[in-house]
């Protein structure tokens, strides 16, 4: 990017948009500060005290980073240009001179400005020897890596990998990058999670939105159009650099807070970016370590589709503590610790140098929908000022950096008009066009999803009659309310589990420690003689994956009248095994049992054979391989990849169940020294088991995985499915001489992985839309609950007429207006939209007037919803005070 020098305006490419303009301005300021140029080439022949040109920053934003020390004229060029002064044209961008010693002759300054040459450069704004540096239009241009669409020095540093762009710290990146200070890149709300952590002091100032009168249902949990805003922390000084030492000239500047840039065309500030201060290179201070570049707390600016916050974010640049160590400085130019792992390094999940998980999973900041107080400032207001003493609530100094907490009470945004009461938006178009049913409800969630959730709730709350099932104990260890999830085996049962070799049973139980439901897998008659296997159990407890049922606890008990070993897992209500979903049909094996293999011309086509769709099989493959990849990465083996131990919830969601059972049941005393000695063999067996499961799904029958039917089963797969599925099954079932990995099947999955990801995200969109329909229902219920506590109360404070007088009488008439409307013929008028609309207007307190007619129709009261809201609030607060004993 070419940065214009002097008082020139930004080049056309940089002035195209507010964001690009601010970025170009910031690069010019930062490069000029680090090179000591100061924005205009100066030489020894320049006269002191003469400002040759207009300052382009002051001309654009009425503010400048350098304050009074700026070597350009701080006047409005529109008011009239002084003789000999001029502004560069946008169409003639100037190159940033990088060659030292190239001086300008008198009267030949860039841009055609004429006048006495400037005097020597002030030493505090540059490095020694920079006063004589200059450059011409033909001088070499300095390219900023990664700016204006330029290629990044490290190809692995994509914009999606970091929320901020960083340039050269302690040997990070190429040698050119180390010459520039860190620059904050403006990020949108979708890529900038809030960084306001627990270390920040809570803001205790008065917030109108959290007061008791903010909403009628506030006592039950307020919900308004303008949601509450989190406190922001404004950092004094540089973005990523320590404060300038006391006594330096830069600290004595009039505006020590830096340049506030980025205004939109209309003059309304859309963002305020705090650019880096001039580095004190002349002080020869040591280069700070990476830990000093990490803010101790802060918040990010979040831009909504309606408005943008006018304070930028203080994002963390580095997350790993070792990035600032001397070891990183020894990297070769161009090397980066941030590159992701290659497939050869799999199955590592995330490189240790990636951004911290807290940044990726932090709760979204509700401040993104708020309008800051300064948004209501008129457009002709002069330069924005730093937080004044009246605005600052409190401040904190951490590691030499001062943070200010300011009042964040929202103010209306100029030019924006919002509805004055809650309005239900239509269905999102990307969801409306994918609706499978034309008669889907508009104001409530889909019936299918509702029924599924109700079934889950019923199963979770199910209990047994202890008199009918006395064999089930009332309490096992710290679990109670046991409910069998499978038919209990008879007392004299001799048949053992085909998987574990022991009689097993499964229960739902509630843990008395946290009151959460869990699934208990009981191993009958097992005595745990070696507790060293608990090392493997502890490793299983640490695994959290969306396709694995997490193991929580393993304990022994005699509550079942015999020694038993119990595994406690997360409970997923409504789940069924793959065996019962796909292989429980008695006709599924008809293709293999009714006729001999080889007595027909070939397998029947898929639609006649009743086979599963290939897309469903690939969805299962992606989930099962993902679970295996996580397990193998942790150094463990699944060992239960079987249709009877794979749970299916919803439609296609898989979870591997009963993990860790084999590690305890088959633990050998010879493994005392190394419990993980045989894991490599078990992992290879997992791949074979995965191949059998996939082949059974492709044949839609367990008979296809039998050894005598294996060849014909592969012929069935070859005719009815793609070659990729056939190759995957052959790879998993074929015993090879080398060690295989679950990552080897990724090329066979190929682009189908993105198909499954797209389907999952579309499903998420549909569920979010259903959730959005239910957002307002809870609020309206709270309003009705509060209204019901007021209306028709027989007595209050020994006054039997309390509900029929004063404000309560208005609320009684409003209740009749809400629910007891009749038609001209006297028939009941039932209209849900009327009820919802009136409740929303009451909650918002709109100035609309309504007529309330008494029951005898002798009086008509004309009131506004704002009057009714005031009556509602006062009356309910009176009830609350009486309930708390304050009356």
Swiss-Prot record:
Chain positions found as Phosphoserine: 354, 361
Chain positions of motif PABPC-interacting motif-2 (PAM-2): 284-299
Keyword terms of this UniProt record: ATP-binding, Coiled coil, Cytoplasm, Metal-binding, mRNA processing, Nucleotide-binding, Nucleus, Phosphoprotein, Zinc, Zinc-finger
Pfam families: Pan3_PK
Subcellular location: Cytoplasm, P-body
Region (Necessary and sufficient for interaction with PABPC1 but not needed for interaction with PAN2): 147-498
GO BP annotations listed: deadenylation-dependent decapping of nuclear-transcribed mRNA; mRNA processing; nuclear-transcribed mRNA poly(A) tail shortening; positive regulation of cytoplasmic mRNA processing body assembly; protein targeting
Gene Ontology molecular functions: ATP binding; poly(A)-specific ribonuclease activity; protein kinase activity; RNA binding; zinc ion binding
Spans annotated as Knob domain: 789-887
Location of the region described as Pseudokinase domain in the Swiss-Prot/TrEMBL record: 463-750
Origin: domain of life: Eukaryota
Principal subcellular localisation of the protein: cytoplasm
UniProt: ATP binding residues: 521, 570-577, 644-645
GO cellular component: nucleus; P-body; PAN complex
Region annotation Disordered: where it falls in the sequence: 111-139, 280-307, 321-393
Zn finger limits (C3H1-type): 49-77
Comp. bias regions, Polar residues: 281-290, 298-307
Function, as annotated: Regulatory subunit of the poly(A)-nuclease (PAN) deadenylation complex, one of two cytoplasmic mRNA deadenylases involved in general and miRNA-mediated mRNA turnover. PAN specifically shortens poly(A) tails of RNA and the activity is stimulated by poly(A)-binding protein (PABP). PAN deadenylation is followed by rapid degradation of the shortened mRNA tails by the CCR4-NOT complex.
Family per record: Belongs to the protein kinase superfamily. PAN3 family.
Domain description: The N-terminal zinc finger binds to poly(A) RNA. Contains a pseudokinase domain. The protein kinase domain is predicted to be catalytically inactive because some of the residues important for catalytic activity are substituted and it lacks the equivalent of the binding site for a peptide substrate. However, it has retained an ATP-binding site and ATP-binding is required for mRNA degradation, stimulating the activity of the PAN2 nuclease in vitro.
Record text on subunit structure and interactions: Homodimer. Forms a heterotrimer with a catalytic subunit PAN2 to form the poly(A)-nuclease (PAN) deadenylation complex. Interacts (via PAM-2 motif) with poly(A)-binding protein PABPC1 (via PABC domain), conferring substrate specificity of the enzyme complex. Interacts with the GW182 family proteins TNRC6A, TNRC6B and TNRC6C. Interacts with YTHDF3.
Protein name: PAN2-PAN3 deadenylation complex subunit Pan3
Protein encoded by which gene: Pan3
């Amino acid at each position: 990017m070419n940065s214009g020098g002097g008082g020139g305006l930004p080049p056309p490419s940089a002035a195209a948009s507010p964001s690009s303009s601010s970025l170009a301005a910031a690069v010019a300021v930062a490069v000029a500060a680090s090179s000591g140029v100061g924005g205009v080439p100066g030489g020894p022949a320049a006269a002191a005290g003469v400002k040759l040109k207009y300052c382009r920053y002051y001309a654009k934003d009425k503010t400048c980073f350098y304050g009074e020390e700026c070597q350009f004229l701080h006047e409005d060029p529109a008011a009239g240009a002084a003789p000999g002064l001029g502004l560069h044209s946008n169409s003639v961008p100037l190159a940033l001179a990088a060659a030292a010693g190239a001086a300008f002759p008198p009267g030949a300054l860039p841009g055609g400005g004429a006048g006495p040459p400037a005097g020597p450069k002030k030493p505090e704004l540059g490095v020694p020897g920079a006063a004589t540096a200059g450059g011409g239009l033909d001088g070499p241009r300095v390219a900023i890596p990664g700016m204006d669409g330029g290629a990044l020095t490290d190809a692995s540093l994509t914009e999606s990998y970091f929320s901020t762009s960083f340039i050269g710290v302690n040997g990070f990146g190429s040698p050119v990058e180390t010459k520039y200070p860190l620059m904050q890149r403006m990020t949108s709300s979708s890529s900038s999670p809030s960084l306001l952590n627990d270390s920040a002091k809570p803001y205790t100032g008065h917030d109108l939105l959290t007061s008791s009168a903010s909403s009628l249902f506030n006592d039950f949990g307020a919900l308004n159009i303008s949601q509450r805003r989190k406190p922001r922390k404004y950092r004094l000084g540089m973005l990523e650099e320590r404060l300038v030492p006391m006594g330096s000239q830069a600290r004595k500047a009039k505006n020590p807070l830096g340049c506030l840039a980025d205004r939109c065309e209309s003059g309304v500030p859309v963002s305020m970016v705090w650019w880096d201060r001039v580095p004190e290179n002349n002080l020869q201070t040591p280069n700070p370590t990476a830990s000093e570049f990490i803010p101790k707390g802060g918040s990010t600016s979040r831009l909504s589709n309606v408005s943008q916050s006018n304070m930028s974010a203080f994002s963390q640049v580095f997350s790993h503590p070792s990035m600032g160590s001397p070891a990183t400085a020894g990297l070769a130019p161009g090397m980066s610790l941030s590159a992701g792992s290659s497939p050869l390094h799999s199955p590592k999940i995330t490189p240790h140098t990636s951004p911290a998980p807290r940044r990726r999973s932090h709760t979204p900041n509700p401040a993104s929908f708020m309008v800051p107080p300064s948004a209501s400032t008129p457009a002709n207001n002069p330069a924005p000022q730093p937080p004044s003493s009246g605005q600052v609530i409190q401040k904190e100094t951490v590691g030499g950096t001062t943070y200010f907490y300011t009042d964040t009470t929202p103010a209306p945004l100029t030019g924006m008009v919002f509805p004055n009461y809650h309005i239900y938006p239509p269905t999102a178009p990307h969801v409306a066009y994918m609706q499978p049913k034309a008669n889907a409800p508009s104001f409530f969630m889909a019936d299918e999803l509702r029924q599924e959730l109700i079934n889950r709730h019923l199963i979770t709350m199910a209990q047994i009659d202890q008199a009918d099932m006395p064999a089930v104990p009332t309490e096992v260890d710290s679990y109670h309310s046991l409910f069998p999830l499978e038919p209990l085996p008879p007392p004299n049962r001799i048949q053992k589990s085909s998987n574990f070799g022991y009689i097993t049973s499964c229960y739902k139980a509630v843990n008395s420690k946290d009151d959460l439901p869990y699934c208990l897998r009981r191993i009958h008659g097992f005595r745990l003689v070696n507790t060293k296997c608990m090392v493997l159990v502890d490793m299983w407890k640490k695994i959290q994956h969306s396709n694995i049922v997490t193991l929580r606890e393993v304990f022994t008990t005699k509550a079942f009248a015999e020694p038993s070993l119990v595994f406690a897992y997360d409970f997923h209500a409504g789940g069924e095994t793959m065996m019962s979903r796909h292989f429980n049909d008695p006709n599924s094996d008809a293709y293999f049992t009714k006729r001999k293999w080889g007595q027909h011309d070939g397998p029947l086509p898929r639609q006649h054979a009743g086979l599963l769709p290939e897309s469903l099989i690939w969805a299962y493959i992606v989930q099962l391989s993902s679970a295996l990849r996580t397990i193998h990465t942790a150094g463990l083996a699944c060992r239960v990849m079987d249709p009877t131990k794979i749970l299916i919830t919803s439609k296609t969601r898989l979870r591997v169940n009963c993990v860790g059972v084999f590690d305890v049941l088959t633990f050998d005393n010879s493994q005392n020294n190394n419990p993980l000695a045989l894991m490599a063999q078990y992992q290879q067996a997992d791949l074979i088991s995965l191949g059998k499961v996939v082949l059974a799904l492709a044949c839609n029958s367990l008979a296809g995985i039998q050894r005598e039917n294996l060849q014909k089963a592969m012929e069935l797969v070859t005719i009815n499915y793609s070659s990729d599925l056939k190759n995957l099954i052959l790879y998993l079932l074929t015993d090879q001489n080398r060690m295989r990995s679950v990552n080897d099947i990724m090329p066979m999955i190929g682009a189908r992985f993105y198909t499954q990801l797209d389907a999952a995200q579309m499903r998420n969109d549909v569920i979010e839309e259903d959730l959005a329909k239910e957002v307002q229902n809870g609020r309206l219920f709270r309003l009705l609950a509060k209204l019901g506590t007021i209306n028709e109360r027989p007595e209050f404070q020994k006054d039997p007429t309390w509900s029929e007088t004063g404000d309560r009488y208005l609320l009684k008439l409003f209740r009749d207006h809400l629910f007891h409307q009749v038609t001209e013929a006297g028939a009941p008028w039932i209209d849900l939209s009327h009820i919802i609309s009136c409740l929303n207007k009451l909650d918002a307190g709109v100035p609309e007037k309504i007529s309330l007619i008494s029951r005898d129709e002798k009086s008509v009261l004309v009131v506004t919803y704002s009057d009714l809201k005031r009556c509602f609030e006062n009356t309910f607060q009176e009830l609350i005070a009486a309930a708390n004993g304050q009356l």
